[in-house]
Structure formats: C-alpha cells, structure tokens
C-alpha cells in the first residue's frame, strides 16, 4: 500500500538522487545536468557508470562510497554527491574522495609517465556552507589548484564544484537557463503536483516521467519510502536538537547519520540523542 502523498520523488533523498542521476537508463539526465552546470567549460557527450564503492590499498583502509561515479567519453572522472547537512570535515572528505579516481589511473609497470585524466568532484549542498573562502551571494563555487600569488592555474586536472542549492530562490516564472530549471527541480520536485509549462522540454519530460511515484514497483516504492523516512527522521531530529539548543556533538551525530541514510530510531547507540529530540 502506498503511503507517500507526493506525486513525484524528492531528489534530496538517497533513493531519488541515485535513481535520477546514477542509473544507466537515466544517464541522459545526468549528462544534461552536468552540461548545464559546466555551461560550455566542459561538454559531456556520454558517461559510463563506474563502481561507486572503493577501498584503499589494503583491506584495513576505510571505504569510500560515492553517490554517483562515472567517466565521460574522454576518460575523465566525475564524482557527484548530494550533501544534505553540515559536516565538520566535509572539505577534507571531498579531498579524500578525489584521491580514489586519481590513484586508480596509475598504470602498472615502468612505462607510465604520470599523465592524468581530469577529475571532477561535484557536490550539491542542501545547506548554506558559510565558508570564509566563498562569496555569500554566490551559489556556484569553482575550486582548483592555483598559485596563491598570481591566482593562475597550477594544475588543471582536479576541479571541485560546490553548488549551494539551498541559496537558490527563483520562482518558476523566473527560470531562464537550463541550469536554473535543474536547481528548481532539485529543490522542489516533490512539492509539485504536475509538470509546469516552464519545464516542458524533452529532458524534463523524461525526468518527470521517471520521478512519478505511481509508476514504481512495490519494491521500488518500499525502497523510496524507507529512504524518505530516513531523510525526514534525521532532518526532524536535527532541527529539534538545534531548536532546543542541544549539544553540538548530538547535532553532529544526527547530521552524520543523515549522510548515511539511517533512520535514527533504528540506531540503539543513539537512543540518548533520539530521546532528546522527541
């Protein structure tokens, strides 16, 4: 039995994000989003999805599991992540993630000359990052390896793109670019009860058709509802803890759990936090 009232999935959930951007049948949606983000700086013609789970050089190393990991027709690597809540060392985590697509390019033997393909880390942030390096009124942040004095590019093989989608506040009639439209649906898809005229293009026709919950199988619906519940549970717990002025540690735990997609009530070792936020 369906319990979800919305017509379309939320792209902020783990299930919704990966269904739209991380599956082979929907790779055209990922390609369109990336091209709208890069706006001519990079033109992606095709993508191949790669294994999103990585481990280090030895079995004791920590795993890294990406939301979406793919390469384009030139062999350049893309990690695409949705980050729903602040994490203390999030920038360090992004840098750590970047080491995997860099290291896996190493060729065995003595013939490799260390030439690398470009690696892009694209992160969609569902909160205000409030980073001192960023302009407060800017949504897109483009980070690379630069000389501090000249501000010229030192090496162009590693790019971080942070997109603070929570700052996007255009109304539907104000959407001008394809990129505007993507940011709008990332924020608002699950709130819509029909496909607006402003979003009736070939790619968004595909998106709305794929995102319609009524078309899900029972298994897909169950998986989505679990993902949505996990998202709402942790969000509600986080908001409640912040309102009550609970400890930063408790709030940080809730935020970290949100990234793991875990319903808070199912974590016995977090019973104290859960009780605080009831």
Model-derived features: positions:
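Accessory alpha/beta interaction modules
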Residues: 1-161, 169-171
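Short, charged alpha-helical interaction segments and adjacent helix-coil junctions
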Residues: 2-6, 78-83, 183-278
């Amino acid at each position: 039995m369906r319990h979800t009232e919305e017509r379309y999935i939320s792209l902020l959930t783990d299930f919704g994000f990966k269904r739209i951007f991380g599956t082979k049948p929907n790779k055209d949606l990922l390609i369109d989003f990336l091209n709208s983000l890069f706006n001519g700086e990079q033109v992606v013609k095709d993508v191949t999805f790669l294994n999103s789970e990585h481990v280090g050089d030895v079995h004791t190393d920590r795993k890294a599991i990406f939301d979406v990991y793919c390469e384009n027709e030139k062999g350049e690597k893309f990690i695409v992540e949705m980050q729903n809540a602040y994490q203390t060392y999030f920038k360090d985590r992004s840098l750590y993630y970047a080491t995997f697509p860099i290291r896996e390019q190493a060729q065995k033997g003595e013939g490799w000359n260390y030439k690398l393909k470009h690696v892009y880390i694209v992160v969609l942030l569902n909160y205000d990052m409030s980073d001192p390096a960023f302009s407060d009124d800017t949504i897109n942040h483009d980070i690379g390896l630069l000389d501090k004095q000249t501000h010229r590019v030192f090496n162009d093989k590693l790019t971080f793109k942070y997109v603070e989608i929570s700052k996007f506040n255009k109304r539907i009639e104000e959407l001008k670019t394809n990129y505007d439209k993507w940011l709008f649906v990332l924020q608002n898809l699950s709130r819509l009860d029909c496909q607006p005229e402003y979003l009736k293009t070939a790619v968004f026709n595909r998106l709305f058709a794929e995102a319609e919950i009524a078309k899900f199988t029972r298994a897909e619906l169950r998986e989505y509802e679990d993902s949505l519940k996990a998202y709402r549970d942790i969000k509600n717990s986080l908001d409640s803890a912040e309102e009550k002025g609970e400890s930063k540690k408790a709030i940080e735990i809730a935020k970290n759990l949100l990234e793991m997609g875990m319903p808070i009530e199912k974590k016995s070792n977090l019973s104290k936090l859960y009780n605080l936020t009831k």
